[in-house]
Amino acid sequence: MSSLPLVVSFYTLDTPYEEEVKYLQASCESFQIENQIEGIPSAGSWERNCAFKPIFILKKMEECQRPLLWVDADAVFIRPLENLSVFSADFAVRIYPCPEDHPSKIVSATLFINNTEAARNLVYLWAKECLLMLEDKERVQEVWDQDALRRVLFTKAHKAQVVPLPVEYSKIVGHPGDEEECLDPVIIQNQASRRYKRWINHPEERLLGW
């Protein structure tokens, strides 16, 4: 078994992500990166599909019993995966230098999840927070899985050792700061949600040809 984490991801069937994920799959094949990337039915909305992320990760933790590296389906490997010091922690995530209550404080597009009980408990709390946010009848804002994770990391009791993931593992294409800071990325994130969110959320528009 490789000492590197197993790359895991999912994409939604019968959506544009079926084509988008092919770039991720091809990049994994090109660099011989071990991966398990699965197609799943859409839950009917972009936010519900995203909220499935921690549940999928828990499933993979149970099945694989090894460290995992989650990458969003619209990601692409630009160079080979390397063994990082952060892979000894329970959990690693990209953290921005902004206030802890900012919804974009962390970026969940790439995540390292170790095969530890502390990491498993953290992901469970994340899944629970996603569901609580989705079920909040008074909410007026869209639910982001990364905001649910932020809440868990900074406001919930957990025992996981959480460390920052290097920007090279989660460079956001088009982000001014990332473009300036990261010139040699391992993984780029293409933010396909900007193109496909409306497509997924409004099937009636597709039926009408809008």
Regions inferred by a protein language model and the residue ranges of each:
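Short glycine-biased active-site loop of nucleotidyltransferases that positions the nucleotide triphosphate
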Residues: N49, L84-S85, G177-E180
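GT-A fold catalytic core of metal-dependent nucleotide-sugar glycosyltransferases
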Residues: A51-I106, T110-T116, R120
